[in-house]
C-alpha cells in the first residue's frame, strides 16, 4: 500500500515545494533572493547524511494471537511495504529497524530508546476481531487499513525524532496530522487516491470503536498524552473533508462531522499541509 502511495506523495511534495521555492525567490520588492538551497551536510567521515534504510525484522511468535498477527504481516508483506515506502520517500539519518514482534499487548509504537518501529503481532489480529463485530463482511481489510493508518501515525513520531523536527503542541496530535498529510496528497491528476482516503477513514473508524468501548472520557483520559478517541475521530474526518470538500462531501452529508467544524476544515488542512511540506521537504529523496 505504502509503495503505491509514496510516489504520489513525492510528486505532490515536489510540486508544493517548487511553488514555495518560486514564492521565496522574490522579496517584497521583487528582487531575487541570494539564499543558497538546502543540502545535506556531510558527517565527520565526509559522507553525506541520509544514507540510512528502514530494515524489516521479524521476531518469534508463541501466543495464538501473535502467531495469527505475524501471519497477517507476512502473508501480505505489510512490514516490507511500509519499509519500502519509507525508503522511497526519506533520506534517513541512520538505519531504522521495523520489527514485527510479540508484545503481549495490542500496540504499535516508535521506540525512542531503541530507535526502532515496533509493530506488535497482536495489533492486526485484535483489529480483525474488532471489525468483525461491526458485521464487516471482510474484517481483515479494515484491520489492515487501520494498521497502515496507525503506522503512519507512528511514522510521524519517527520523523520528529530522526530529524529533530520542531513540534508545537501535543506530539500525539501532530503525529495524527502526519498520517493525514501522507494519505491526503493528490496525484498528478490533482485527485486524492481513493484507497489512501479509505485508510484514513478506517483509522477514524477504529478510534470510534475504541471511543465506544471506553465510554465517557474521565479525568485520566483528558490528562493523557493522546486526545480522547472521539476528538481524534473528528480531527481525521475534518482533515479528510478539508483536503477535498467536494470529493469527501459524504462525511458532512452523512452527519459524521458537524457543520460548525466542517466550514473551517479546508483552511485547517491547508495549514497542516503547508507546515509539513516545509518541515519534510529537506529530508525527501530526489527521484
Regions found by a protein language model. Give the residues of each.
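C-terminal motif of bacterial Sec signal peptides marking the signal peptidase cleavage site
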Residues: 14-17
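Pan-zinc metallopeptidase signature
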Residues: 42-59, 63-64, 218-287
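Bacterial N-terminal signal peptides that target proteins for export
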Residues: 1-8
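Active-site/pore-lining binding-face segments in mid-to-C-terminal subdomains
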Residues: 184-237
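Short alpha-helix carrying the canonical HExxH Zn2+-binding catalytic motif
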Residues: 140-160
Amino acid at each position: 500500500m505504502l509503495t503505491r502511495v509514496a510516489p504520489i506523495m513525492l510528486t505532490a511534495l515536489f510540486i508544493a515545494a517548487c511553488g514555495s521555492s518560486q514564492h521565496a525567490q522574490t522579496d517584497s520588492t521583487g528582487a531575487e533572493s541570494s539564499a543558497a538551497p538546502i543540502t545535506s551536510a556531510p558527517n565527520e567521515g565526509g559522507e553525506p547524511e541520509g544514507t540510512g534504510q528502514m530494515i524489516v525484522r521479524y521476531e518469534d511468535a508463541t501466543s495464538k494471537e501473535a502467531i495469527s498477527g505475524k501471519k497477517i504481516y507476512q502473508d501480505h508483506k505489510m512490514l516490507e511495504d511500509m519499509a519500502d515506502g519509507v525508503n522511497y520517500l526519506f533520506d534517513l539519518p541512520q538505519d531504522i529497524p521495523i520489527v514485527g514482534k510479540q508484545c503481549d499487548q495490542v500496540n504499535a509504537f516508535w521506540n525512542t530508546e531503541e530507535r526502532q518501529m515496533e509493530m506488535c503481532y497482536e495489533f492486526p489480529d485484535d483489529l480483525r476481531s474488532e471489525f468483525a463485530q461491526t458485521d464487516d463482511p471482510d474484517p481483515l481489510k479494515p484491520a489492515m487499513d487501520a494498521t497502515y493508518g496507525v503506522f503512519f501515525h507512528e511514522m510521524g513520531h519517527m520523523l520528529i525524532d530522526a530529524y529533530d523536527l520542531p513540534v508545537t503542541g501535543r506530539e500525539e496530535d501532530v503525529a495524527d496530522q502526519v498520517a493525514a498529510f501522507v494519505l491526503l496528497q493528490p496525484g498528478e491528476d490533482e485527485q486524492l487516491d481513493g484507497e489512501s482516503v479509505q485508510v484514513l477513514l478506517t483509522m477514524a473508524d477504529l478510534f470510534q470503536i475504541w471511543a465506544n468501548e471506553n465510554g465517557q472520557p474521565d479525568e485520566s483520559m483528558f490528562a493523557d498524552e493522546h486526545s480522547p478517541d472521539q476528538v481524534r475521530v473528528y480531527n481525521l474526518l475534518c482533515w479528510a473533508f478539508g483536503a477535498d470538500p467536494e470529493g469527501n462531501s459524504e462525511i458532512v452529508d452523512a452527519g459524521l462531522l458537524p457543520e460548525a467544524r466542517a466550514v473551517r476544515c479546508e483552511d485547517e488542512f491547508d495549514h497542516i499541509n503547508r507546515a509539513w511540506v516545509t518541515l519534510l521537504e529537506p529530508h525527501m529523496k530526489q527521484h
